[in-house]
């Protein structure tokens, strides 16, 4: 594959934990309960994907690893919810931008992600960026793999975040 | 160096709540190991200048990576043709096309770094008994996909708790 893809930047996140909820019966609204607890505990969710099909609900959320002890304390008070959550520690996000809603670009990035061998746990497009969740230990290596096929401007900013905004 | 700043709003500010109607939602479930093959197929779909309005993906089930892809109605033909390709059927565990659907989205200042946005939006919809098919948040964007005719009601519900210009 030639070096034909163009992007303005690639950004990597801080270390996060992936939280999943899967409910296969009606009558429970685990997402609402989870979001309420996180909101009340002032915990940000940098990534969220939630889908419902028939009576099944499946949600995937990212929480900064430093916030996980507070999140677990908040969730412990809701036993029904707590038993339905699964945690995958040490994940991170790679954001490539802009995607310009272009399927050729997005498809090529997905193909590269698949070829890199890094697992994909989640993906979401925003107004500009395409954000993918994978193992934190593989973030830098995956970003380097992408840059073998994606041209970035010579003056693009560093991959790693230079500031850390924390909600209090 | 640590800098502490306070950003507080009585009502959370957005840059506007938008609703798009008459959209197509394709939900394609694949085995995670087939990601590169799906990417290849998606890239080929893009050669026809097909634009996607939104893509979300996550593990709907443990060994199943579900892609939710939203397109404008004018791309429906390409989408149906795409989903019927043997090469796409071969890598898919299931394909569901839902149309028409409606998409509501909004962006706001520093949404990617702030807590409580998704909770406030979800709560406002729940109070009006408005169910979504898919919800996604990343960076400063929040997206919901609804069945037909729910978009305007959802916009009204969210307009009561978020500030819009």
Question: Where is each model-derived feature located?
Answer:
Chain B
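A conserved regulatory-domain signal marking ACT and ACT-like small-molecule sensing domains
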Residues: 1-165
């Amino acid at each position: 594959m030639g070096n034909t893809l163009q992007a303005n930047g690639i950004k990597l996140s801080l270390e996060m934990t992936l939280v999943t909820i899967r409910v296969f019966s009606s009558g429970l609204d685990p997402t609402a309960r989870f979001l309420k607890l996180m909101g009340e505990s002032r915990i940000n969710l940098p990534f969220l994907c939630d889908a419902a099909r028939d009576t099944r609900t499946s949600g995937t959320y990212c929480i900064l690893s430093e916030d996980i002890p507070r999140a677990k304390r908040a969730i412990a008070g809701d036993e029904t919810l707590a038993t339905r959550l699964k945690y995958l520690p040490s994940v991170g996000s790679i954001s490539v931008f802009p995607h310009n809603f272009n399927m050729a670009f997005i498809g090529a990035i997905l193909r590269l992600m698949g070829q890199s061998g890094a697992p994909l746990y989640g993906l979401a497009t925003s107004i500009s960026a395409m954000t993918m969740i994978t193992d934190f230990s593989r973030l830098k290596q995956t970003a380097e793999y992408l840059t073998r096929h994606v041209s970035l401007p010579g003056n693009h900013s560093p991959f790693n975040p230079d500031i850390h905004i924390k909600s209090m | 160096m640590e800098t502490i700043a306070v950003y507080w709003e009585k009502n959370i500010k957005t840059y506007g709540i938008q609703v798009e109607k008459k959209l197509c939602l394709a939900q394609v479930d694949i085995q995670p190991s087939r990601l590169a093959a799906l990417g290849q197929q998606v890239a080929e779909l893009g050669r026809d200048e097909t634009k996607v309005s939104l893509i979300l993906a996550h593990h709907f089930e443990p060994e199943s990576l579900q892609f939710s892809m939203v397109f404008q109605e004018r791309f429906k033909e390409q989408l149906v043709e795409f989903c019927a390709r043997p090469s796409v059927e071969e890598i898919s565990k299931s394909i569901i096309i839902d149309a028409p659907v409606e998409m509501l989205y909004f962006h706001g200042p520093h949404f990617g770094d702030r807590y409580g946005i998704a909770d406030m939006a979800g709560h406002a919809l729940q109070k009006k008994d408005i169910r979504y098919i898919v919800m996604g948040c990343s960076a400063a964007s929040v997206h919901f996909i609804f069945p037909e005719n729910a978009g305007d009601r959802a916009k009204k519900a969210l307009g009561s708790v978020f500030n819009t210009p």
